[in-house]
Structures are given as C-alpha cells and as structure tokens.
Amino acid sequence: MNRLTHCFNELKQRNTKALVTFITAGDPDLATTQAMIPLLQQAGADIIELGMPFSDPMADGPTIQLSSERALAASTTLERILAMVRAVRRSCQVPIVLMGYLNPIHAYGYERFANDAAEAGVDGVLVVDMPPEEAESFLNHANARDLQVAFLLTPTSTDSRIATVGRLGRGFVYYVTVTGVTGARQQVSTTLGGELAKVRAKISVPIVAGFGISTPQQAADVAAMADGVVVGSALVKLFQLHSGEELRQEVTRFVASLRQAIPGGAA
C-alpha cells in the first residue's frame, strides 16, 4: 500500500488529521533537507511536501520564492533531490510528496521521472501548473508506478473541474484556502467550511487545505474542517531566519506546536 494511503487510513483510525509540512528541497542545501525530513516527522509531521525549486514559481509568494532562489544557488536539481530522497529512505518512511512546476518534470521526461521517483521512494507528486484535463500522459506513467498524483482545487474551481479532479486525482486533493500566491495570512476564511463541504460531496480521496496557514490556532481551525492541513511559508521562513542547531530547534518547536493544536494530535 502506498505510504500516503496508509497514513490517511491510520490517522482516520486515530480520529485525528494530517499535518502536512512543506519545505523547499535544497534550502539552504540538500544535506540540510535530508536531516530535516526525519526531524519534521519526529516533531509531529505526518506527510512531508518537498518543493522542487524553480526559477519562475508563479504561484508562490516572496518567502517561498526566496527559498527557491537559495536552493537553486546551492545547485539543487531534480536528479539530486531524488538521490537525497533515496538516502532518506534508508532510515525514514514518512510519506513524501514532491510539489512544484511542470517544466523541470517535462524536461526530465515523464516516464523517467515516474520511474526514478518511485524507485527513490517518493509517494506522490503535485504539479501546480498542470491542469488535470491535460495530465493524461503524465498520469499514465505515474499510475503505473503507484506514484499518486494530487491536484489543486481553489474557491473558484468549477463543478466540472472538481469532478475531473475527483476522477483523476489520487492520494489527496490540495484545497487552496485563498486566491492568490502562497504566504502567511492573518485569519482563516469564514467560508472555508462550506467550500470544503461542496468539494467533499464530489471527492472520495482525503482533502488537505493550505496556503496562508501560519499559527497553531489556524491549523486547528482548518483541520477541524479538512482531512489535513498544510503549513508552508511560515515554516520556510524559519530557514531564512535561522541556521544550524538554532534552525533545528525552531523547526521542532514550531511543528510540535502545530501538531499539538490539531484535534487528537497532542503528543
């Protein structure tokens, strides 16, 4: 069974929700990323999203854009990310999802990417700028290797798009809680509950929600409505502000506070 599927099944049995943490692979370098993955799991993360750095991250706000720039400056490539995941898998089995843009995957080759990612131990992939209606070739290769492809939905997604994502997506659906780019927000949308209920009526896979979640209270509020909550920019910001042991301590403290705030998630 795919690690993502197993993770959501286990969380449901425990009556809690998934904490999904996003960091950029290679920020500040891949050695740090490799060390951070088990640290995130130990602090309470259930699923790790690894951002694949890209030179034109159109959906990302300044925090993740700067993170991508730092990773690219450290010579981070898709091939090196997969080698790092392969090394992580020697001792850590936390579900790992690669998230990013289509261009690097297209350049790598769909079949080669699906094969190499699956062999490295990647469980899922989310391509921000790949509409599900245009994903057939990529999906064929990914599904053949049990590489679960997730898609984004937003508050402006049509019923037709929701139905298509429900038919084609696997692993989970990533619901974007706000329109615009990534980045911390002050509060959770008051309409989120109704929006998620509309999606849930048409979707059978778990729904995780993210974009803008930066505090334990926000994480708790979103987790009460979704199957999981994604925290990205607020975590990535720590990589800009800290390094070394201080970074490890700050990441551990922040992730543990998120996990403890989620209903049923206290250690």
From Swiss-Prot:
Broadest EC class assigned to this enzyme: lyase
Any one GO MF annotation of this record: tryptophan synthase activity
A single cellular component GO annotation: cytosol
Pathway: Amino-acid biosynthesis; L-tryptophan biosynthesis; L-tryptophan from chorismate: step 5/5
Top-level taxon: Bacteria
UniProt-listed HAMAP family: Trp_synth_alpha
Official protein name in the record: Tryptophan synthase alpha chain
Naturally occurring in which organism (per UniProt): Pelobacter propionicus (strain DSM 2379 / NBRC 103807 / OttBd1)
The organism's taxonomic lineage, starting at the top: Bacteria, Pseudomonadati, Thermodesulfobacteriota, Desulfuromonadia, Desulfuromonadales
